[in-house]
């Protein structure tokens, strides 16, 4: 299963960084692979929030429905999308760092069914996709990439 992790030090206080990251409406602001986001349940981030995230795919656009599975403000947010071809798990953790915070964004992608046999190939492309998203995230958080959250 391809996995991508980035740690970003930002001047934003933890509550502000968490609120920005947990609102998936903001994905389109920082991830160039996201075309559009529509919230279909809830109002803003929260434990009941559900979002349709339209992402660029090989043959056009694919819409993934993300359901919030963990919401522990201002520290941890997890959203999961499961469809016939794939399962996506996005985890965001935030910890205090001086007057700012460190945001850790982790994305895991699992191909389902017979597609799981091409997971290694997807892993190669997923690294490049993750790097582009990380660049946008660093810019959106006015931050810098760090090697670890500690």
Region roles according to the model:
Residues 5-9, 63-65, 89-91, 106:
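Well-ordered beta-strand positions in beta-sheet-rich domains
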Residues 11-14, 71-72, 97-99:
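Short loop segments at secondary-structure junctions
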Residues 15-18, 131, 135:
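Amphipathic alpha-helical segments that line or abut small-molecule/effector binding pockets
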Residues 80-132, 149:
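Beta-strand/loop substructures that line and gate deep hydrophobic ligand-binding cavities in soluble
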């Amino acid at each position: 299963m391809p996995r991508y992790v980035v740690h970003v030090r930002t001047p934003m206080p933890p509550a502000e960084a968490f609120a920005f990251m947990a609102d998936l409406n903001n994905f389109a602001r920082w991830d160039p692979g996201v075309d559009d986001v529509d919230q279909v349940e809830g109002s803003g981030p929260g434990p009941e929030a559900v979002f349709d995230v339209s992402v660029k795919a090989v043959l056009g656009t694919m819409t993934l429905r993300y359901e919030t599975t963990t919401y522990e403000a201002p520290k941890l947010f997890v959203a999961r999308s499961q469809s016939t071809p794939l399962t996506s798990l996005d985890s965001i953790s935030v910890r205090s760092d001086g007057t700012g915070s460190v945001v850790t964004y982790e994305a895991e992608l699992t191909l389902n069914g017979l597609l799981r046999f091409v997971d290694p190939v997807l892993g190669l492309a997923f690294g490049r996709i993750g790097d582009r998203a990380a660049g946008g995230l660093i810019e959106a958080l006015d931050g810098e990439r760090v090697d670890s959250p500690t």
